[in-house]
Amino acid sequence: MFNINRKIRKAILFAGTLPFIISMHGPGRFEEMEKEILHFVNADRKSNGLKPLELNSFESSVAMEHSQNMASGKTPFGHKGMEARIRKINKEMGPISNAGENVAVGQMNASEVVRGWLNSPGHKRNIEGDFTLTGIGYAKDKKGEIYFTEIFTK
């Protein structure tokens, strides 16, 4: 979990991210996960009286790049470089008043990714935060573990 307010704080707050090792269920699941993660995130938001997040393709490309960098070992698992990702989104899409990021790692399905985030107070704050857009990306490492990134903005 990482959240940046209007002043884009530089403090990095980890919410106790632990690897979630859950097996995927059959071929094709990997390609569907972005939509499934969005579905589960928005279902939680709806159950809390919040508006759904809109999936943004540019934010998803930024999230995918971060997941690829973590999977390749170019950057460690976590939120390193979050400020640069938000600047990149800001440059492309205009001013951002609020931003956050959730990451996860392991072979898992979308339901388990979101359930893990919802069981972590910091990640849950992002899912239920004051955001309107989201980007979701994932990548596999050489061992087959999947790295997930979800970026939230307003």
Segments (PLM) and residue ranges:
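Bacterial N-terminal signal peptides
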Residues: 14-20
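Functional surface patches built around histidine and acidic residues
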Residues: 2-10, 21-154
